[in-house]
């Protein structure tokens, strides 16, 4: 038995149609077509984000491709960002002495479409509600999700190169435990 191995490298997330053809020693062959879904998970750990010292927030941007092509069936199902960071800034300096309000960290995720239009953000989530997933007691966990059939549709914000942005509006530099971006195709 002999065969051929095909290796795919550096594929964009999405849907791909492939065909496998098997030919026996007598020259008879059969072909089977399948669809392969290439998903993506990117995780960044131990980040730091600067403080808002000039009355404008500090952003760290992460771009990702999204495809929503109903004609070919190459459609993103979901894009999600998961942000985890410590609740308290460990090297905090009280701006208003004794107040301590600036020591309680609050970092948000913002999502922008391919034309830099803001689609959604986590800023309305209260400090006590930042417990998405398996969030430990001393960390905050926020999640921002976009669904393919709604967010990436032609009638809404469209597909293309989207951006997930970590935003710090606080005065303090803050640590970030991790950011995970997941792209899932059907």
Protein language model annotation of sequence segments:
Residues 1, 8-12, 16:
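Residue-level recognition of secondary-structure-to-loop junctions
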Residues 4-7, 32, 58-60, 148:
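Short strand-edge motifs at loop-to-beta-strand transitions and within beta-strands
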Residues 9-12, 25-26, 110-186:
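Noncatalytic accessory or regulatory domains flanking protease catalytic cores in secreted, cell-surface
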Residues 16, 20-22:
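Hydrophobic/tyrosine-rich beta-strand signature of extracellular beta-sandwich/beta-rich modules
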Residues 28-38, 179-181:
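C-terminal edge beta-strand
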Residues 37-45:
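Extracellular interdomain linker/stem segments of modular secreted and single-pass surface proteins
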Residues 38, 83-87, 168:
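Short beta-strand segments enriched in hydrophobic/aromatic residues
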Residues 54-131:
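Acidic, Ser/Thr/Pro-rich low-complexity intrinsically disordered segments
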């Amino acid at each position: 038995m002999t065969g051929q191995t095909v290796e795919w490298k550096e594929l964009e997330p999405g849907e791909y149609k492939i065909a496998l053809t098997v030919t026996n020693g007598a020259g008879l062959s059969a072909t089977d077509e399948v669809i392969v879904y290439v998903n993506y998970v990117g995780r960044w750990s131990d980040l730091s984000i600067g403080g808002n010292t000039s009355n404008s927030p500090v952003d760290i941007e992460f771009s990702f491709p999204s495809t929503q092509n109903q004609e070919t069936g190459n459609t993103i199902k979901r894009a999600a960002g998961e942000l985890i960071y410590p609740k308290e800034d460990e090297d905090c300096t009280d701006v208003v002495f004794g107040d301590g309000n600036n020591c309680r960290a609050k970092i948000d995720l913002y999502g922008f479409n391919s034309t830099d239009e803001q689609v959604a953000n986590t800023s309305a989530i209260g400090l006590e509600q930042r417990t998405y997933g398996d969030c430990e007691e001393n960390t905050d966990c926020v999640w921002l999700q976009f669904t393919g059939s709604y967010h990436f549709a032609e009638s809404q914000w469209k597909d293309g190169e989207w951006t997930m942005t970590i935003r710090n509006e606080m005065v303090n530099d803050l640590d970030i435990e991790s950011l995970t971006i997941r792209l899932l195709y059907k």
